[in-house]
């Protein structure tokens, strides 16, 4: 196929993204990725725009096997290479399913040499870059009084329980002397009045933990690769989180004087997620 983009996996792994496809944003021309903001890192991928009213997702090929599983379930540390096929010629290889483009992912294999053991761990934090300034109870009451006066209406007719002592000065301009608010918001006196910053109440500093262990080995007769991974993301919205446990075992061996080669690619993923309401 002609239009092929090859992405350096080392650069993606440095980002620490849960979803390896999400890390392709800005690296592949003509590829648009929209994340939903949830801790799982799930994203919508468009390679050739929107061409149908039905499914516009690209075809994912992992080690030669087509899949529709979310890429946030794949451990990015297990990836050896990523190729994005964008032109129509890919349909001659993968059929009509490649109409929206193809993302080919190859996972790691053992390499010839001594046994290699890798372990990495990382902890990072996520938070809002900027916070919206909100009004407290008094500031909101003053703003509402001004709005009622500007509309020529009686501010004491509000439905929130604000009581205003106001009048006009010598020049006829409205002046607010004082204001009061009922102790409770409801008639049954169960909801007390308070200065509540709801942004602070529903958000927190998110914590992302990632641990990966891999063992690889290779010789002239074969190779093997084994990995374990754990990823946990406590979202910035309270009570949202994502957990993923992954295990992978890739191996291939040459038999009968290299006439026959057998191999297997085995992966196991367990995920749990609580999304924002």
Language-model region placement:
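Short, small/polar-rich motifs associated with maturation and membrane association
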Residues: 1-249, 253-269
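Outer-membrane beta-barrel translocator/channel fold
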Residues: 271-277
């Amino acid at each position: 196929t002609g239009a092929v983009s090859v992405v350096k996996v080392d650069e993606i792994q440095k980002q620490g993204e849960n979803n390896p496809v999400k890390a392709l944003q800005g690296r592949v021309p003509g590829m648009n990725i929209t994340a939903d903001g949830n801790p799982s890192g799930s994203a919508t991928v468009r390679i050739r725009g929107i061409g149908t009213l039905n499914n516009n997702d690209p075809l994912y090929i992992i080690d030669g096997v087509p899949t529709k599983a979310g890429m946030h379930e794949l451990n990015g540390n297990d990836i050896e290479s990523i190729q994005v096929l964008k032109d129509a010629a890919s349909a001659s290889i993968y059929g009509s399913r490649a109409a929206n483009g193809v993302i080919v992912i190859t996972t790691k294999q053992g390499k010839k040499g001594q046994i290699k053991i890798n372990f990495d761990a990382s902890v990072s934090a996520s938070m809002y870059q900027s916070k919206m300034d909100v009004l407290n109870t008094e500031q909101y009451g003053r703003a509402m009084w001004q709005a009622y006066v500007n509309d020529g209406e009686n501010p004491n007719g509000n439905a929130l329980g604000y009581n205003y002592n106001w009048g006009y000065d010598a020049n006829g301009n409205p002046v607010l002397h004082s204001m009061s608010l009922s102790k409770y918001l409801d008639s049954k006196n169960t909801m007390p009045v308070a200065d509540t910053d709801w942004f602070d109440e529903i958000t927190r500093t998110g914590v992302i933990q990632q641990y990966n262990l891999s063992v690889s080995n290779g010789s002239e007769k074969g190779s093997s690769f084994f990995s374990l991974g754990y990823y946990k993301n406590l979202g910035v919205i309270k009570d949202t989180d994502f957990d993923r446990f992954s295990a992978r075992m890739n191996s291939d061996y040459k038999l009968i004087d290299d006439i026959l080669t057998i191999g297997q690619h085995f992966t196991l993923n367990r995920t749990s997620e609580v999304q924002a309401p």
